[in-house]
Amino acid sequence: MNTETLSDISDEIKSHYPTMLQSWGIIGISILFKVLFTPVFFLSDYTGKEQTFLVYQVLALGSTFAYAHLRRKKTTGISTYDFNPASTKIMVLLAVSTICLLVSIRVPLVSVLPRPEWLPDLSKTFTVNNPYSIVSLVLVAPVLEELIFRGIILDGLLHKYSPVKSIVFSSMLFGLIHIHPIQLVSAFLIGLFAGWVYYRTSKISLCIFIHFINNFLITLVVLFYTDDTSTDTLAATGYRHYLIYLFILMAVGGVAIYLLNKEFNTQGRNTASFSSPSRMSNLNEQTK
């Protein structure tokens, strides 16, 4: 017999953070911190641009996470995140899925959506042999951004809204903070994948791993190739050959995601921890 009452579930759902409106508030706070810490770049003449960007990333993203984390803790009493690793099989499937998704999306986007002139060319901003740029893009960004967008925003939304609405909305916000048109689209799609993985596992560690693979590959491309190089390479390869190449990548990625889904089903989902609207609907039916 189900002893859970409508009042119990209603109170539980109200206690979670954030709502969609509050999620927009987190984005606003993020923009505010980015503006407030902009003067840090004046130090680049003394410390170097890579070191300065690393400090800026830590301050801006770290402050945003601290704000959202404290709000979440105050509202829900929750202050922990699941950093437990997954099996080697899952990690390999995640890596393959992410690589296929990234390559099949980014190369055609580069040829269709060239970098706007008002945006800086990162290949001229960072040097490949500088460890600070690698730490900024491959370590700091994946950890802090995933804690914000999956660990806090998506986690809170999943307790209030349907999984599809929660994942799409949080991914849209994740895409919007990446100003570059190519990054916006690819970040949205990677966000959908990471969001689905988080919904199935509740493990922030897996989302960080996906983001790490994504940023690591993008960093290599940005540091070794320009946008023009990518476009020329696509033209030289031939669009027919590229379509075959794209189909193979999508097929491999699709198989990897299928196997990943089977693995999640085998190991059991953690989705029961989320208070979905379906629970409210079912309970309403029981109380009629």
Segments predicted by a language model, with ranges:
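Short, Lys/Arg-rich, polar N-terminal cytosolic tail immediately upstream
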Residues: 1-17
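Alpha-helical transmembrane segments in multi-pass membrane proteins
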Residues: 24-72, 90
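Membrane-interface helix/loop boundary segments of multi-pass membrane proteins
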Residues: 144-169, 196-203
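Functionally important transmembrane alpha-helices
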Residues: 33-40, 183-239
